[in-house]
Amino acid sequence: MSLAMRFWTLVVNALCIPMHIIKALGLYEGYKRVFPIFLQRISINYNKKMHDKKAELFRSLSEFAKPGKKLTLLEIGCGTGANFEFYPPGCKVICTDPNPHFKKYLDKSMKQNDHLTYDQFVVASGEDMASVEDESVDVVVCTLVLCSVEDVPQTLREAHRILRQGGAFFFMEHVVADPSTWVHFFQHVLQPAWYYFGDGCEATRATWKYLEEAGFSELKLRHIQAQLMFMINPHIIGYAVK
């Protein structure tokens, strides 16, 4: 299967040559303006299918607030604010995303989720959140984002830096499938096209390995099969404590 996988990956890569050229010319940036429209629709469907899993994951968020104080939470790659409904009442939310075109969707989501306190929207990548102080938040949330960042280890280092001691990094990410499966085969074959469709998304990352090496004192992680499009069925879910 490895030889066939390499061959068909090359075929798909060749078909994507026009997209490679568009990106090289700097024209791909225009897609970032319309990507929030697609993501909003995708997020609604994702939340319907993953509602119970998200509710289960975020149920323990409040446990990481300082005694007698409300939770301070920073979300990396907040997108359209699809996670807001799962955050506890009174939670102070700091939103970050490298795409400034999400802002109007984010504002709408904040109005719909008035049980939260909206702190600020920071246009920043997960790899560089220099404007956020060290050990300043109780929780960092990252869902369907580590598949798209350019540097996973650096993003996790930044999350670790801004978390206070005893704080937690919550995650829900799609990952590469087991090598013995056809899902693994198609993830690799379709990856060249998937990258452009998903605004830099990579379906072939073994993200759990980065989490295991990120230096957290405790890691609670489990693999699940989400009932989604086959390319993103394999998921990891859990949290890591600083």
Q: What is each stretch, according to the model?
A:
Residues 72-129:
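Class I SAM-dependent methyltransferase SAM/SAH-binding core
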Residues 153-165:
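A short glycine-rich, Lys/Arg-flanked "PGG" loop and its adjoining helix->strand segment in the class I
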Residues 235-242:
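C-terminal lobe and adjacent flexible extensions of AdoMet/dcAdoMet transferase-like proteins
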Residues 138-151:
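A short SAM/SAH-binding and catalytic strip from SAM-dependent methyltransferases
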Residues 1-29:
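N-terminal auxiliary segments of SAM/dcSAM-dependent transferases
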Residues 21-34, 38-51, 172-234:
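C-terminal alpha-helical "lid/dimerization" subdomain adjacent to the S-adenosyl-L-methionine
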Residues 45-72, 82-86:
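Conserved alpha-helix/loop element of class I SAM-dependent methyltransferases that forms part
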Residues 127-140:
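A short acidic, Gly/Pro-enriched loop at the edge of an enzyme's catalytic core
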